[in-house]
Amino acid sequence: VWEDYTYYITHGIGDNTAKNFAKRYSEWWCDRFDRVIVPTAKTENLLRQYGVEAPIDIIPSGMDLRRFAPERHSAKERAATRAECGVPEGKRVLLNIGRLAKEKNLEKILRVFPELHRRLPDVQFVIIGEGPLKQTLQEQAEALGVADSVSIVGSKPWEEIDRYYAIGDVFVSASHSETQGLTYIEAAASGLCVCAVDDPCLLGVFKDGVSAILSGDGDEQLLESLMLSFSPVGTRIRRNAVEAARPYSTEQFAQRVENCYLTALGERQRGLSPVVL
């Protein structure tokens, strides 16, 4: 969502003006098309709030789910990747993969981690990614006294990212800036229990307590959701995770996009397409 990223241009100076420009530009641009494809109802609702009037189709982005299949990774490979990420033998892994930036809300997760670690000392928090917040997160972990149990390992090649998902037990996110959140799907396809602060982008994607653990915004709520994720409930969700990710395959995505294009072509042939002024 462009309005969530204007800070990187304005650095806080005139940011409201930049956000309004992003909204107006989005409206102008989308209304020039016969149909608009968005990944979630959250994005559709946002565009409607901007004033977009063009027909909108909700088609979640697809991915090659086969590359994330848990059985692709041997115990030997997992052990080597865990060692690479600084995970001691016998530890369970709380995992986050993504850009280390303020909109991802990683500071919230780190705030609750000391208490999670006090209750579950066998949990290691592994953060994979790069971004402007990396040093801040390292300093926060040190200040909270959990630096030895937090591994911030930097970015990894996209071609190998499935290998890093494979070491996780629970995938955590507190972001509200996602339009779809592909990392949630990648984590589920990798057989992890997804624990996320609830967000409209997850509507229709996961069912709380069945295919993921969805938390409220408060720190205490996130802590309790993480505890639940490492309980037998989380173990059950992990068994269902791969099936929950199945609707997001590249094959289903391609079929839905083809149907959308056929609809747009049919409307244009019948003279039903909107006129762009």
Question: Where are the language model's segments positioned?
Answer:
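Carbohydrate-associated surface elements
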Residues: K42, G62
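A conserved mid-protein helix/loop that constitutes part of the nucleotide-sugar donor-binding site
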Residues: R92-E115, F125, P132-Q138
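Short alpha-helical donor nucleotide-sugar binding micro-motif in glycosyltransferases
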Residues: S155-K156, R163-G168
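Aromatic "clamp/platform" in nucleotide-sugar-dependent glycosyltransferases that forms part
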Residues: H176
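Conserved acidic donor-binding segment of nucleotide-sugar-dependent glycosyltransferases
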Residues: D208-E220, L228-V233
